[in-house]
Regions:
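Short beta-strand->alpha-helix linker/helix-N-cap micro-motif
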Residues: 3-67, 80-86
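Extracytoplasmic
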Residues: 9-17, 28, 32, 44, ...
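Amphipathic beta-strand/beta-sheet edge segments enriched in Tyr/Trp
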Residues: 62-141
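Short loop/turn segments that connect beta-strands within beta-propeller blades
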Residues: 111, 177-181, 221-225, 265-269
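A flexible loop/linker signature enriched in serine peptidases of the S9 family
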Residues: 150, 162-172, 188-191, 208-218, ...
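Hydrophobic beta-strand positions that form the internal "hydrophobic ladder"
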Residues: 157, 202-206, 246-250, 290
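A short beta-strand motif characteristic of beta-propeller blades
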Residues: 182-187, 226-231, 270-275
Length: 290
């Protein structure tokens, strides 16, 4: 008889040498990008990053051939190499007068001895201050190509930040990167806010606010920080959620002594009642196909 107790998952060993800096101004950024990629992949539990001091080969030229034998010798199954610079691009305008932060990188299968990307490399560009976002996007690419699953590193979390004394907590609507970095407060502490939810494309939020004295569902454009109450009827509303296509919102609406579910079309403003029973219906969400 064979008794099965636990499954064993061995993390895939990857090499992520420090990205090359093509100009001195981005030396520290290049180092931080490679470190953040390593942190992202390590947190999944699926990958183990081989320490730099164990590397036999040093990547000193982004265009140089890969010494596969050296990477096999330290049991690396994958290699991520990259280079960073700042340049002015024709297809992308950055506000920084120096230009955009440009990161190019390659992903190699060491045992198959090939470059995983069909065109040899990938290139991302953004404002120089957005290097963390570029690192997360690269980690997403690596994760997808090695697991077949969509990465989640370049994502945001919406939450309610609390501060103040125990009996008078102040709440603010906030967002942050998935790893807790880049916290941004979207509202002040003057009004109670609850239940933030992202739109499918991540550009908007719906949430419950007591700004008008009673709970009402608000919609905010994250880029402009502009917000407005979704339904101007004189009824309390709360617990919103976007539809999968982002074109409507489902929420709870109070009418008299009854609380029912409604959908609101964001394009036409048309409201449709979904329930009419005596019970309180709340915290609804759509199925994946809407």
């Amino acid at each position: 008889r064979i008794k099965i107790t636990d499954g064993v998952i061995e993390p895939v060993p990857l090499a992520v040498p420090k990205f090359l800096s093509e100009i001195i101004a981005v030396k520290e950024i290049a180092k931080n990008i490679s470190l953040l990629i390593s942190e992202d992949l390590t947190k999944t539990g699926l990958f183990r990053i081989i320490p730099d001091e164990a590397h036999i080969s040093n990547v000193t030229n982004f265009k140089a051939s890969v010494a596969y034998a050296d990477w096999k010798a330290i049991n690396a199954q994958g290699l991520i190499s990259g280079a960073v610079t700042i340049a002015k691009l024709k297809k992308q305008l950055c506000l920084d007068p120096r230009g955009c932060l440009v990161v190019k990188f390659k992903l190699f299968d060491i045992f198959a001895e090939n470059n995983i990307f069909n065109n040899g490399q990938k290139i991302y560009a953004a404002e120089p201050g957005e290097w963390r976002r570029l690192a997360h996007k690269i980690a997403d690419d690596v994760y997808f190509n090695l697991t077949g699953e969509i990465g989640y590193f370049n994502t945001k979390i919406a939450f309610i930040s609390e501060s103040g004394v125990k009996n008078n907590r102040l709440k603010r609507l906030a967002i942050m990167d998935y790893d807790g970095a880049n916290v941004e407060f979207l509202t002040d502490q003057s009004d109670l806010v609850l239940t933030p939810r992202f739109s499918p494309n991540g550009s908007r939020l719906v949430y419950t606010s007591f700004k008008l004295g009673e709970p009402h569902v608000f919609l905010m454009d994250i880029k402009t920080r502009g917000s407005f109450v979704l339904d101007e009827r004189n009824q309390m509303s709360f617990s919103p959620q976007f539809s999968p296509n982002g074109q409507s919102v489902i929420m709870s609406v109070v009418s008299g002594a009854n609380t029912d579910l409604y959908t609101l079309d964001l394009r036409s403003g048309t409201r449709r009642r979904l329930t009419s029973g005596p019970a309180i219906e709340t915290s609804a969400s759509f199925s994946p196909d809407g």
